[in-house]
């Protein structure tokens, strides 16, 4: 055949293929129109974390035996465990424990392999700071209990204000019957 005719045929095939791809993507876009929105208004609405969410690590100083298993199983050797050997009781005494959350990958190995369960993952995910050195948590900061999402003051006020609006709407729409 002539090269010009084959060129037009391949151009026509490419045009049909491109139209098919655009049509498929348009159908995909239209299939998402009936779904609920996923975006939340972050400071006022907080996402509910799943059951095994890996957030900030909680540390219980009294349970730790300074075995350093958490350091050995960590892929980046992150936890810093300072201890000294007490000769009179023949055991290690923990002096300091710290984790730098700026480097932590939240894999959960330290929590999973801890023999005394002194480490646990919390649902706390708000670790933003202006200085990366503030992400280095010592044992005091790690032992701080997490703030639950439902106990947050801003969330409670928003939830209560919407309930009061709903209650007002119900009371204005309902009739009251009084006995005389």
Swiss-Prot record:
PROSITE patterns: 4FE4S_FER_1, 4FE4S_FER_2
Binding residues for [4Fe-4S] cluster 1: 64, 67, 70, 114
Topological category with respect to the lipid bilayer: Peripheral membrane protein
Residues given in the record as [4Fe-4S] cluster 2 binding sites: 74, 104, 107, 110
A molecular function (GO) term: 4 iron, 4 sulfur cluster binding
Sequence ranges assigned to domain 4Fe-4S ferredoxin-type in this UniProt record: 55-84, 95-124
Cofactor list: [4Fe-4S] cluster
Note accompanying the cofactor annotation: Binds 2 [4Fe-4S] clusters per subunit.
Record bears the keyword Membrane: yes
Top-level enzyme category: translocase
Pfam families in the cross-refs: Fer4_7
E.C. code: 7.1.1.-
Iron-sulfur found in the keyword field: yes
Keyword list, A-Z: 4Fe-4S, Chloroplast, Iron, Iron-sulfur, Membrane, Metal-binding, NAD, NADP, Plastid, Plastoquinone, Quinone, Repeat, Thylakoid, Translocase
InterPro entries: 4Fe4S_Fe-S-bd, 4Fe4S_Fe_S_CS, NADH_quinone_OxRdtase_chainI, NDHI
Subcellular location, record wording: Plastid, Chloroplast thylakoid membrane
GO cellular component: chloroplast thylakoid membrane
Catalytic activity entry: a plastoquinone + NADH + (n+1) H(+)(in) = a plastoquinol + NAD(+) + n H(+)(out); a plastoquinone + NADPH + (n+1) H(+)(in) = a plastoquinol + NADP(+) + n H(+)(out)
GO terms (BP aspect): photosynthesis, light reaction
NCBIfam families: ndhI, NuoI, PRK05888.1-3
Functional description taken from the UniProt entry: NDH shuttles electrons from NAD(P)H:plastoquinone, via FMN and iron-sulfur (Fe-S) centers, to quinones in the photosynthetic chain and possibly in a chloroplast respiratory chain. The immediate electron acceptor for the enzyme in this species is believed to be plastoquinone. Couples the redox reaction to proton translocation, and thus conserves the redox energy in a proton gradient.
Assembly description: NDH is composed of at least 16 different subunits, 5 of which are encoded in the nucleus.
Family the UniProt entry places it in: Belongs to the complex I 23 kDa subunit family.
Name of the molecule in the record: NAD(P)H-quinone oxidoreductase subunit I, chloroplastic
Native source species: Agrostis stolonifera
Gene that produces this protein: ndhI
């Amino acid at each position: 055949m002539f090269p010009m005719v084959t060129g037009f045929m391949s151009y026509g095939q490419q045009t049909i293929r491109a139209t098919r791809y655009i049509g498929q993507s348009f159908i995909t876009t239209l299939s998402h129109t009936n779904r609920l929105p996923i975006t939340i208004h972050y400071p006022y609405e907080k996402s509910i974390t799943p059951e095994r969410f890996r957030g900030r690590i909680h540390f219980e100083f009294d349970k730790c035996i300074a075995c350093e298993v958490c350091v050995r199983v960590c892929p980046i050797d992150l936890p810093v465990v300072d201890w000294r050997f007490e000769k009179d009781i023949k055991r290690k005494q923990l002096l300091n424990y710290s984790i730098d959350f700026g480097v932590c990958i939240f894999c959960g190995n330290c929590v999973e392999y801890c023999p005394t369960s002194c480490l646990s993952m919390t649902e706390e995910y708000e670790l933003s700071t202006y200085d990366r050195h503030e992400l280095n948590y010592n044992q005091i900061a790690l032992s701080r209990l997490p703030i639950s999402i439902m106990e947050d003051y801003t969330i409670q006020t928003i939830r209560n204000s919407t309930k009061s609006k709903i209650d007002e709407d119900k009371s204005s729409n309902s009739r009251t019957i009084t006995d005389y």
